[in-house]
């Protein structure tokens, strides 16, 4: 199974609501972007149209991969004389004005159109039945791999350094830890600062280094003020550093909770960036209705959890990371964890499976188009992988519980210590290779298939 082979294979359209105000100070544009993240798009708009970054507002962050339509608010004036503006592969169309900057309150839903490729004919035929299963059961509302960008790029959980008050390590993880997966100028900038840490009088030769100018300006003023430099990072990125750890603990707590309530035989497992997830294939109606109406906490120091089973699962996941609620504080800083309740399950709306067709990118394979809506904050990639779990190499049925695992290290997640009746998510998958090893194996397999396809019939 492959998704996002082309940008048009993964299309997201933001559903929105705002009060039009003909005299409002915020000009609202609909932005069409592809192969660029929302934060990167805002940075480009700021440069191209000479707008202060803090005067740009959005409803929510969207993934870099794929094609996205979403709103952008501009405080203080229009970007140009024309209603339609183009900046590279960004297209902006003025749709109105508003009294307030955009925020998450303005988003109503996200509509997805996803093309799943590289399916065998048998796998393609199974998709409608599996989609019907998802409609009956729903999907656990986990945070998927996109939530863990710092982890993906080898920077670990930056929040762990922050909780210890180790601002230098946190800044080094952000500014000077290049990803092995990234060949961009940004990675070269991070390599430069890894090799020249502390030599703040230097200048990275790549243009991408300009985005870190406020951080470096502070370090040139005071070379040991790592805290002040870290607080010059874009606010959204600082928040994401905290959210990654909080989201991981949420995922681990939900796994514990579901493992205590659902028989292992009814669960499947899927790997993701931070480990493995468990999802039910079927649920008794009474339990399903209960779980559909339940939330699960994103924990913070002020969390008060009434339900005993939820509390045991959430706090058990936190303890497995060597933390308590009281320790979820960043000392002497404006950064903080906030308690929130997140729906435990999500139900894709208007889920439609289109008939299989030949896949023009993968010889002899089929492609299937899926379309559905999700509420803000839910992950379409998880819905797609749940529907196509049988075609996902990282998926296996959950077979048995396992012995407790060791607590996590500082820079990467580890499997939590589990109660005896909880299934081991690692038992759901074959022995796990590293991400880079899996990428190399896929490339080698594709190369072998191409080589085999070039050989004449009957050749051995």
Question: Which residues does each PLM region occupy?
Answer:
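Generic structural marker for isolated residues within well-ordered, non-membrane alpha-helices
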Residues: 42
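Basic Arg/Gly/Lys-rich low-complexity intrinsically disordered segments
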Residues: 4, 222, 387, 397-460
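Extended, charged/glycine-rich binding lobes that contact polyanionic ligands
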Residues: 1-17, 21-22, 26, 34, ...
């Amino acid at each position: 199974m492959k998704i996002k082979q082309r940008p048009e294979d993964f299309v997201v359209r933001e559903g929105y609501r705002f009060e039009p105000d003909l005299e409002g100070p915020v000009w609202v544009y609909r932005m069409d972007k592809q192969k660029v993240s929302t934060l990167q798009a805002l940075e480009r708009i700021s440069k191209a149209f000479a707008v202060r970054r803090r005067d740009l507002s959005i409803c929510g962050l969207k993934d870099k991969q794929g094609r996205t339509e979403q709103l952008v608010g501009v405080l203080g004036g229009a970007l140009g004389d024309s209603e339609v503006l183009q900046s590279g592969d960004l297209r902006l169309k003025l749709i109105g004005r508003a009294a307030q900057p955009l925020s998450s309150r303005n988003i109503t839903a996200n509509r997805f159109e996803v093309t799943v490729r590289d399916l065998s004919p048998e796998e393609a035929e199974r998709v409608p039945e599996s989609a019907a299963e998802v409609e009956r059961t729903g999907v656990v509302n986990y945070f998927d791999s996109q939530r863990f960008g710092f982890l993906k790029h080898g920077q670990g959980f930056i929040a762990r350094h922050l909780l210890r008050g180790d601002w230098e390590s946190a800044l080094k993880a952000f500014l000077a830890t290049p990803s092995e997966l990234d060949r961009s100028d940004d990675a070269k900038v991070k390599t430069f600062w890894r090799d020249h840490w502390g030599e703040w009088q230097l200048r990275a030769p790549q243009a991408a280094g300009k985005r870190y100018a406020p951080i470096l300006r502070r370090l040139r003023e005071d070379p040991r003020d790592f805290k002040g430099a870290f607080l010059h990072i874009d606010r959204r990125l600082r928040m994401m550093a905290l959210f990654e750890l909080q989201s991981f603990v949420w995922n681990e707590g939900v796994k514990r909770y579901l493992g205590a309530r659902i028989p292992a035989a009814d669960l499947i497992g899927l790997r993701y960036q931070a480990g493995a997830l468990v999802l039910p294939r079927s649920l008794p109606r009474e339990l399903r209705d209960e779980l559909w109406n339940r939330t699960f906490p994103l924990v913070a120091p002020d969390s008060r959890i009434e339900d005993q089973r939820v509390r045991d699962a959430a706090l058990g996941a936190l303890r497995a990371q060597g933390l308590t609620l009281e320790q979820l504080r960043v000392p002497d800083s404006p950064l903080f964890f906030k308690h929130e309740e997140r729906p435990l399950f999500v139900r894709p709306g208007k889920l439609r499976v289109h008939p299989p067709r030949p896949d023009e990118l993968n010889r002899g394979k089929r492609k299937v188009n899926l379309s559905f809506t999700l509420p803000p904050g839910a992950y379409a990639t998880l819905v797609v992988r749940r529907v196509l779990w049988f075609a996902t190499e990282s998926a296996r049925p959950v077979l048995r519980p396992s012995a407790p695992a060791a607590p996590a290290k500082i820079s990467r997640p580890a499997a939590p210590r589990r109660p005896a009746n909880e299934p081991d998510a690692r038992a759901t998958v074959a022995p796990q290779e590293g991400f880079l090893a899996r990428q190399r194996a896929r490339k080698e397999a594709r190369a072998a298939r191409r080589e085999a396809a070039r050989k004449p019939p009957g050749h051995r």
